[in-house]
């Protein structure tokens, strides 16, 4: 089957055990290790939820690395890294960077919501907790108060800029993006983004909802007009763009996490077992703070028979 197609959870649940059982019996030790390059926003999701459950259910050991999705896809496309599995926070970006040369299919398995997390004891945090609209409070905040991700390294960064653009329209504040600039400071990684909030270096950060949950920080989700969580607003999101250093224009789109097993994977069977495990355990993914709507999982490209049957 090619193109975009929904795949029922029943299909995954019905055969997940068979695939995991088969690969668990055949692979042990180093051969059972699965190298995963994953979006940085999934660090706690994988380490605290998915990895322990998957390793308990199989003889496989995950070897995850976490990077911004733009960075990890570049590491694969330029031959620097050769993982078994890639997981991106932007499904379209994964297809654009990996299809044809490195992968033939991608499974979309989760969504997320953009917003702002904050430290309640800070001046900005107190205003947010009191109900001041985030954008008014942010404009008034002291310089370098709000941490944001680097748009050149991961989708969280360029979605943040797109959200500011869409928020300007939503709130009839045409200069909002420029007005927010003094209060924001760009961080090179998603892990540092929240580490600096937790240590008090910054009062807030623009993040995905699961990241705030991971760090036990209050979270204010942006409205549907610019939280990139409402598929029915896809055309509206697409009106916001970000242009990369190489001139590629990226349009806003709903947040969708996608994964694939690379064509040159060293452990193809293990990688497929892990992908199936993700798709077959939506409640586990939800417990980690992500969303799994009824429209997921779905896929692009021709799924391997082992995943589709």
Swiss-Prot record:
Species of provenance: Halobacterium salinarum (strain ATCC 700922 / JCM 11081 / NRC-1)
Query: Which PANTHER family does the UniProt record give?
Result: MOLYBDATE-BINDING PERIPLASMIC PROTEIN (PTHR30632), MOLYBDATE_TUNGSTATE-BINDING PROTEIN WTPA (PTHR30632:SF16)
Q: Which PROSITE patterns match?
A: TAT (PS51318)
Family as reported in the entry's similarity comment: Belongs to the bacterial solute-binding protein 1 family. WtpA subfamily.
Q: PTM per UniProt?
A: Predicted to be exported by the Tat system. The position of the signal peptide cleavage has not been experimentally proven.
Among the Pfam families in the record, one is SBP_bac_11
Q: Which residues form the signal peptide?
A: 1-32
Q: Is Membrane given among the entry's keywords?
A: no
Entry-linked InterPro entries: ModA/WtpA, TAT_signal
Protein's UniProt name = Uncharacterized solute-binding protein VNG_1595C
Keyword Signal in the entry? The reply is yes
GO molecular-function term, one example from the UniProt record: molybdate ion binding
Biological process terms from the Gene Ontology for this record are:
molybdate ion transport
């Amino acid at each position: 089957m090619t193109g975009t197609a929904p795949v029922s959870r029943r299909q995954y649940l019905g055969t997940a055990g068979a695939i995991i059982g088969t690969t668990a019996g055949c692979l042990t030790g180093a051969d059972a290790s699965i190298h995963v390059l994953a979006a940085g926003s999934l660090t706690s999701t994988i380490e605290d939820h998915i990895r322990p459950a998957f390793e308990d259910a199989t003889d496989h050991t995950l070897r995850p690395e976490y990077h911004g999705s733009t960075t990890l896809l570049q590491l694969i496309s330029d031959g620097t890294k050769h993982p078994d599995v890639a997981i991106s926070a932007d499904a379209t970006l994964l297809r654009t960077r990996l299809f044809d040369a490195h992968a033939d299919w991608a499974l979309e398995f989760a969504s997320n919501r953009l917003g702002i997390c904050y430290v309640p004891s800070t001046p900005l945090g107190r205003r947010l907790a009191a109900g001041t609209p985030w954008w008014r409070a942010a404009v008034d905040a002291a310089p370098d108060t709000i941490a944001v991700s680097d748009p050149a390294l991961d989708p969280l960064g360029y979605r943040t800029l797109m959200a500011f653009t869409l928020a300007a329209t939503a709130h009839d504040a045409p200069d909002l993006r420029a007005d927010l600039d003094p209060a924001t400071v760009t961080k090179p990684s998603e892990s540092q983004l929240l580490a600096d909030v937790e240590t008090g270096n910054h009062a807030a950060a623009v993040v995905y909802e699961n990241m705030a949950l991971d760090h036990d920080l209050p979270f204010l989700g942006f409205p549907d007009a610019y939280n990139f969580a409402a598929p029915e607003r896809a055309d509206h999101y697409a009106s916001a763009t970000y242009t990369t250093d190489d001139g590629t224009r990226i349009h806003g789109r709903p947040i969708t996490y996608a994964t694939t097993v690379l064509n040159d994977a060293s452990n193809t069977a293990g990688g497929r077992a892990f992908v199936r495990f993700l798709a077959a355990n939506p409640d586990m993914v939800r417990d980690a703070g992500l969303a799994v709507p009824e429209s997921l999982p779905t896929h692009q490209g021709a799924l391997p028979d082992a995943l589709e049957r």
